[in-house]
Amino acid sequence: MILVALALVALAVAAPPAEEPVQILRSEFNQQPEGSYQFGFETADGISRSETGDVKEALDEENKPHKVVVVRGSYSYTDKEGNPETVNYFADETGYHAEGSSIPKPARK
């Protein structure tokens, strides 16, 4: 029992110090009754994100109409080497599509 108590004390002492929470500089969200939305935020450590979603009519595999949400947005941060990175993306009935310097480009034939 003493060994268990000593092990717990050792773990508590060896634990890394808790990080301070990052301040939110800006945060907004707006949703419309029909399903469209906008949101964004920015933090004190340089992370930011913004996104919009709009409802549109699309056809499924059987050519039946249905509604989909088309999403467009971007996020930015600083990587471990100190380089700024921004990723722009959109998603619709064809899938998720993203572009940024950290995302590999498909090989061209």
UniProtKB/Swiss-Prot annotation:
Sequence ranges assigned to domain Chitin-binding type R&R in this UniProt record: 34-107
Function summary: Component of the cuticle of the larva of Helicoverpa armigera.
Keywords carried by this UniProt record: Cuticle, Signal
Name of protein: Larval cuticle protein 1
GO CC terms: chitin-based extracellular matrix
Pfam hit, one: Chitin_bind_4
Underlying gene: LCP1
Entry keyword Signal: yes
Molecular function, one GO term: structural constituent of chitin-based larval cuticle
Signal peptide residues on this chain, from the entry's feature table: 1-14
Organism annotation: Helicoverpa armigera (Cotton bollworm)
Keyword Signal: yes
